């Protein structure tokens, strides 16, 4: 296994000028012709035998090879014969040469695979009936297709002690075939060197050397890439077989990236969550919170409507009674006496329905929990609050300036993209804010926001780096905008971005200014005209307050008049429900077909995987029923009609998996000059500094026992490091 600096040096060597490289390609096409089982195929120079075979649809068996990891070539399962070559070659590691005829199904190739498979199975235990990998195991499939029908191994099989690497990944290391996929993933994708090998030959083992937790926010992905049952999910252990589950394609709402997922369910219960391929967002990875927090969907759920009685206690009631009480209050108060706050997990359909309902009572006090400055361009220009370069676009950047953010825990898949570009494209990264572990090296410019002024004026040394960059990115974390000087920070970043565009070699299509959001609902709420932050409610306390999934604790009972009537609509009894006078149980993201917009402005849909528990209903349906009882019926009855209304208000919300370019950067910069606010000297400190802060950030993950175990394991691990044993 090559260390990262060595690998980066080798990558640099591979980028030699073409004049210094001897090639067999023709000058006209730069492609070379090879043959796969007699079938001609044209490929790029440097293409491996395995890639050439896949190009014509020929599948080569493999265990260690993975297209997103470096080539190890140590399982030897991909051995194929090259015509006139003395020996078989490893298809994953051997570059093709002009005129080669690759024989994938020759007797020599088959014999080689059978021999490799026999060696792999010699020490492999017969655990298939009790192995969680059963039914989706590469070793099972390939031994059936390419292996022999009997073994000649008569000696005793070896046994390996299992490793404890945390509460998420279960290890049965006797099943390990030493493909090193997990080691390469940890080192290359996750940026953590916790995993490695010890011993050699028959005594070789994969582990952490000393017993410790695999400290990564992406650790669950080693379960997916493990070709055997050596690494499986601890929470999922012995619960279901893959052929028993129903799979629903959906998206994740634990952060603002919008990772694509597959929800596996059985008998109306979420059994597990797996990643779904999307090259422009999450590739084929997901974060541990996305993967393992699903048990929070079953705990602390609101399943029936509740009202507060004369004694001040919340008691169960019927939908008719609960909606009638709320309708009565909406009929009694109008205008500024009615307000609403939308939480971080709310879908666009519910947001537009609530907006229409409050507009019927002449109120426009619709707020989000997350603050975004309204001074200057504010939220009037969409480019002002999006990740304009896009998530995949970071792979084209040559310089990234991070401001007040820790993307490793606020947006793990975006951070993985930055690491990927840093590793393969020599990306230069700089950070303004508290020093954090980002899994890649960066220049720490300091933690004071006043550094932004120095960069904007050109007096800071990093100004020259940005000026010389061809595709620079400035990424401002939304957490930095929660400060009292958020408007000044946004104006300073906007000024830097515009000056870079004017003075460097940035082309017209490249976008410099980027906002990295943390919560799933924020972009859709801003698109629909919600006011960011609850300052308007604090200044003018309402008589009726509607909390739509608002569990961030941005407002408390003490902030409101004693006679304020609070309605909470959501799916968990978390922060908002205990202060409410009426509770309306809603549906979680796995229980409804809903629209969410990620930080880059891409609209995506969740799908119904299970039905809501008890009497809970979809949020927009509750609001629609409430409007009818209150005598102000909203003009839609079906989901399609709600989405037609979404299209009227903001057409981009129904253009799924599409990103609309936003280019009003110059106008935003001109308006930012009108901001009359000074930068504070307080350091920029992101709320999620360590992995302990990553696991429990919303109502679902806070209800998850698995996430609580992670916090406990990380805390105990940190204490063990701080307080070493006397022995």
Swiss-Prot record:
It is a peripheral membrane protein. Residues 1-23 form a transit peptide. Its cofactor is [2Fe-2S] cluster; [4Fe-4S] cluster. One of its GO terms (biological process) is mitochondrial respiratory chain complex I assembly. It is an enzyme of class 7 (translocase). [4Fe-4S] cluster 1 binds at residues 124, 128, 131, 137. It comes from the Eukaryota. Its main location: mitochondrion. Residues 245-301 form the 4Fe-4S Mo/W bis-MGD-type domain. The keyword Iron applies. Signal peptide: none annotated. Changing residue 228 to A: In MC1DN5; loss of catalytic activity. It is linked to Mitochondrial complex I deficiency, nuclear type 5: A form of mitochondrial complex I deficiency, the most common biochemical signature of mitochondrial disorders, a group of highly heterogeneous conditions characterized by defective oxidative phosphorylation, which collectively affects 1 in 5-10000 live births. Clinical disorders have variable severity, ranging from lethal neonatal disease to adult-onset neurodegenerative disorders. Core subunit of respiratory chain NADH dehydrogenase (Complex I) which is composed of 45 different subunits. This is the largest subunit of complex I and it is a component of the iron-sulfur (IP) fragment of the enzyme. Complex I associates with ubiquinol-cytochrome reductase complex (Complex III) to form supercomplexes. Interacts with MDM2. Interacts with AKAP1. This is NADH-ubiquinone oxidoreductase 75 kDa subunit, mitochondrial. It comes from Homo sapiens. The gene is NDUFS1.
């Amino acid at each position: 296994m090559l260390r990262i600096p060595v690998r980066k040096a080798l990558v640099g060597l591979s980028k030699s000028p073409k004049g210094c490289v001897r090639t067999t390609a023709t000058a006209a096409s730069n492609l070379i012709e090879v043959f796969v089982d007699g079938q001609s195929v044209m490929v790029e120079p440097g293409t491996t035998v395995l890639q050439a075979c896949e190009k014509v649809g020929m599948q080569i068996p493999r265990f260690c090879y993975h297209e997103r990891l470096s080539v190890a070539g140590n399982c030897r399962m991909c051995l194929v014969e090259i015509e006139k070559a003395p020996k078989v070659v490893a298809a994953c590691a051997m570059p093709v040469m002009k005129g080669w005829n690759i024989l994938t199904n020759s007797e020599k190739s088959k014999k080689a695979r059978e021999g490799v498979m026999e060696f792999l199975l010699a020490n492999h235990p017969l655990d298939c009936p009790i192995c969680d990998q059963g039914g989706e195991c590469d070793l099972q499939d390939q031994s059936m297709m390419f292996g022999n029908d009997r073994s000649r191994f008569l000696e005793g099989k070896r046994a390996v002690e299992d490793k404890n690497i945390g509460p998420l990944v279960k290890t049965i290391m006797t099943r390990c075939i030493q493909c090193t996929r997990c080691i390469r993933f940890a080192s290359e994708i996750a940026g953590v060197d916790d995993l490695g090998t010890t011993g050699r030959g028959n005594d070789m083992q994969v582990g952490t050397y000393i017993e410790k937790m695999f400290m990564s926010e992406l650790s669950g992905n080693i379960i997916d890439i493990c070709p055997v049952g050596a690494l499986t999910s601890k929470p999922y252990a012995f619960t279901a077989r893959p052929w028993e589950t129903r799979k629903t394609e959906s998206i994740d709402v634990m952060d603002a990236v919008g990772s694509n997922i597959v929800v596996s369910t059985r008998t109306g219960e979420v059994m597990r969550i797996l990643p779904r391929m999307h090259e422009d967002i999450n590739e084929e990875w997901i974060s541990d919170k996305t993967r393992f927090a699903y048990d929070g969907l079953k705990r602390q759920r609101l399943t029936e409507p509740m009202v507060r009685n004369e004694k001040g206690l919340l008691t169960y009631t019927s939908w008719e009674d609960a909606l009638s009480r709320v309708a009565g209050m909406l009929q009694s108060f109008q205008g500024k006496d009615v307000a609403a706050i939308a939480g971080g997990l709310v879908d666009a359909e519910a947001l537009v329905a609530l907006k229409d309902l409050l507009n019927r009572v002449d109120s426009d006090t619709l707020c989000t929990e997350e603050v975004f400055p309204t001074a200057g361009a504010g939220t009037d220009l969409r480019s002002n609050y999006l990740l304009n370069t896009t998530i995949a676009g970071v792979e084209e950047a040559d310089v990234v300036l991070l401001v007040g953010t820790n993307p490793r825990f606020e947006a793990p898949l975006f951070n993985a993209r930055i690491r990927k570009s840093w590793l393969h494209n020599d990306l230069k990264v700089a950070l303004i804010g508290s020093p954090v572990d980002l899994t890649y090296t960066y220049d720490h410019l300091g933690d004071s926001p006043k550094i932004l002024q120095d960069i904007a004026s050109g007096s800071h040394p990093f100004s020259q780096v940005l000026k010389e960059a061809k595709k620079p990115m400035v990424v401002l974390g939304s957490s930095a905008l929660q400060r009292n000087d958020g408007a000044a920070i946004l104006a300073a970043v906007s000024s830097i971005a515009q000056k870079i565009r004017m003075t460097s070699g940035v082309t017209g299509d490249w976008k410099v200014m980027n906002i990295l959001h943390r919560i799933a609902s924020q972009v859709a709420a801003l698109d629909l005209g919600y006011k960011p932050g609850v300052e308007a409610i604090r200044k003018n306390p309402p008589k009726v307050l509607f909390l739509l999934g608002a569990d961030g604790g941005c407002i408390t009972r003490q902030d409101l008049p004693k006679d304020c009537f609070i309605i909470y609509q959501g799916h968990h009894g978390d922060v908002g429900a205990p202060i409410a006078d009426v509770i309306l149980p809603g549906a979680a993201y796995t229980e409804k077909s809903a629209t969410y917009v990620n930080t880059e402005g891409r609209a995506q849909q969740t799908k119904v995987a299970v039905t809501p528990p008890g009497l809970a209903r979809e949020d927009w349906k509750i609001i629609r029923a409430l409007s009818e009882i209150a005598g102000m019926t909203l003009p839609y009855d079906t989901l399609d009609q709600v989405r037609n209304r979404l299209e009227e208000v903001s057409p981009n919300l129904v253009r799924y998996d599409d990103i609309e370019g936003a280019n009003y950067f110059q106008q935003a910069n001109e308006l930012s000059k009108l901001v009359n606010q000074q930068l504070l000297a307080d350091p920029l400190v992101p709320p999620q500094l360590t992995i302990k802060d990553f696991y429990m950030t919303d109502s679902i993950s806070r209800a998850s026992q698995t996430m609580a175990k992670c916090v406990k394991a990380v805390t105990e691990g940190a204490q063990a490091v701080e307080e070493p044993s006397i022995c």
